[in-house]
Amino acid sequence: MKKTFFQQYILPAALLLATGLTSCKKLIEIPANPPTEIVQSQQFADSATAMTAVVLVYSYVAQQTGSGFGYNDAKLPESTGLSSDELIYTSPNIPDMTAFSGYGLTNLNSVVGQLWTSPYASLYPINAVIEGVNASNGLSAGFKKQITAEMQVARALYYFNLVNLFGGVPLSLSTDYNVTEKLARASVDSIYGQILSDLTSAQQNLSADYPSSGHIRPNQAVATALLSRVYLYRQQWQQAYDAANTVIASGSYSLPSDPNQVFLDGSTEAIWQLPATSLYYVTQEAHDFTPQFGAAPNYIINTWLLDAFEPGDIRTQDWLGQTVVNGDTLYYPYKYKNIQAGSPTIEDYMILRLAEQYLIRAEASAELGNGAAALADINVVRARAGLPASTANPASQTAVLNAIMHERQVELFTEWGHRWYDLKRTGMAAAVLTAEKTGWNANAALYPIPILQLQDDVNLKQNPGY
């Protein structure tokens, strides 16, 4: 019998999670004796077998995950941190990483290839679950809505990153190879249209309660929080404000007073987290950013980011590590601190957190003409960092927006590509990166389509400049 996608790739991952990774909490309950073979026609016959398929998808996603949700090997925080003004790469181990800093990317770059293929590898099983549960005659309408909504949130997040890295990309919503084999690039507007469709549908069908322990499987707030980000990027200011306000006003989340508590399992700030599943280290970020055995860090904080922190900002103590190499003090990202698996302190990958919602509501308020409300929101984030209230003039929209961008820079650094995306969406990239770095040109705002994808799909067209 020919193995299904789940049998061949996802089930072994789930079994590994269930039996071998005792240091990681379970994503959702895995049956005591999970099946070793799932026939395609039986995968969604009832809620038990359907949940097995869902477990497999989450297991697969978690095994790939860096803070970029399925971008572990692709190094999303690292590559976008180098493309922006956050990081400097010091190691000779991955030559293709250096190209991100000097805007020398080509369609042969292996990291760019992973940035493309990693999300599409996860989109296939996500689409398979959506199709499977909705085609089943053995599942209740409520169950179908719940699982479909969870998968829609995951799909929306993948496409959000794809469209911000590459621009228009193939929009694959099916598992039918005849449909997906030669897809052309959908427009940016079409991609965002699908993202909004998925998230608004999910928001309507998810409960306020999380469907499992922890903040792993999405609830309604997860869909709403991601919607607020998407609305912000689309300059739909009132919708962005309303969505962020809904999450903040719910009272379900709070900012820990200690920044060191933010990225821990069960953080009160966490809207959506996934557990790390590596056998050898806790999170990809801790592994990549934290120096070991007295060596220099592979990635150090760029001077421009270091200088952006104000005196007295405790984030420099809690979220920046430092080491002395050859007499030079080097700083590195230290939001995730645990290097070795089995650490007594569990850190989870943070996907969505409350501080971003405050900053989204602040920016939306500023764009809507309410500078005082905007400053009140960024001051909440500043207070946690041990800083006084912003001195920006609330009557000056430019001053308020600059204050918000500054706060996003020092609060969200090396998370999710926020800085890279912010520079591009606000039109600041040329001015900031031309002043700070060499080699910048407008074409560098989008990464090249990988050569293998162009060879496999004749309908794909390369981005300008590559």
Predicted regions and their residues:
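Long, intrinsically disordered, low-complexity segments
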Residues: 23-24, 283-285, 299, 310, ...
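Membrane-proximal, proline-rich intrinsically disordered regions
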Residues: 24-76, 244, 390, 431-466
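Short, surface-exposed recognition loops and adjoining beta-strand edges that mediate ligand/DNA contacts
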Residues: 40, 68-91, 208-286, 390-398
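Conserved, well-structured interaction surfaces
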Residues: 51, 59, 92-165, 204-207, ...
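Hydrophobic-face positions in mid-chain alpha helices that act as interaction patches
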Residues: 98, 241-354, 411, 444-459, ...
